[in-house]
Amino acid sequence: MEPIKEPKPLVLVSSSPHMHCGLTISKSMREVILALVPAVLASVYYFRVDAVRVIVCCVLSALIFEKLANKVMGVKKDTIKDGSAALTGLLLALCLPASLPSYMAVLGGMFAVVIGKAIFGGLGKNIFNPAHIGRAILLASFPQQMTTWVIPATKAAATAGADATTAATPLAVMRMTEKVWQAGGAAASQLPPLSDLFIGNIGGSLGETCVPALVLGGLYLIWKKLIDWRIPVFYLATVAVITGIYGAVMGYPSTFPLYHLFAGGLMIGAFFMATDWVTSPITKKGKIIYAIGLGLLTSLIRLRGSYTEGVCYSILMMNMVTPMIDRFVRNVSFGGGQKK
């Protein structure tokens, strides 16, 4: 007598939490790309043809290697159409300096798509932000090229000598000496005014300079409910509080935290990188814990670490902690009673 076989279930129900959104993946990706348009336009305005070159190299590289990775891994679905590869390439480009050689930008696109996403099984299965994986590998492989910053075209014409092409970022200048904020500090005169820092008229990565463009795009995503406001707000607030306390203890002016908020990749990281749907926590409380952790790590690296920028590595480190946050900070299941 043959054993009775159970029929295959018609519906498979995965473990909670369950989330639903009226937007498709491709439409969501297009919305994020649209939100990045102001930052892209600002980068082209300040860095001209080099900005276009780096963006094109990164986006095309991401698309090509997405196609190749799918073929190698036997993925039949054409994931190029969902826009995730193009978005990864664009985000990567906005985290790179305008002077980066084209072949390095192409390699960055490959690293982001293949190592950051494909080897984990594709979109939705990656544990790290793909664009920051690409940036981190490029920084480790080509540190000199990744830390060579071009002065914006709006300033280059009025600058002579070697400084007309390269310059230190405000974060690097602040780290030159502990006395930079004190009267007569050796590097104090090299710091750009806050107005230049705010509008992006400084050296830096393509999309890390113009604060209004990034905030505008971020607010658009919050309005469209594509990202949760808690992550950027608590991330930025944590950095502001920690750098403010540190500045007060060290006797620095009250503008010290503003320099940290406006400089480097904090704005693009807070609105576009840390809010990645796949690599950030699901619950509201989890997002707050995640964002505060990002702020703590970013401030620690910037203030006391050997590297002047801490956004990229902070996000990658908190990406690793995200599964643990989701595990211990969960919503109570319907009908499951109170959480113990």
Model-derived features with residue positions:
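Structural signature of hydrophobic alpha-helical transmembrane segments
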Residues: 49-61, 99-108, 197, 201-211, ...
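Long hydrophobic alpha-helical segments that form multi-pass transmembrane helix bundles
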Residues: 130-215
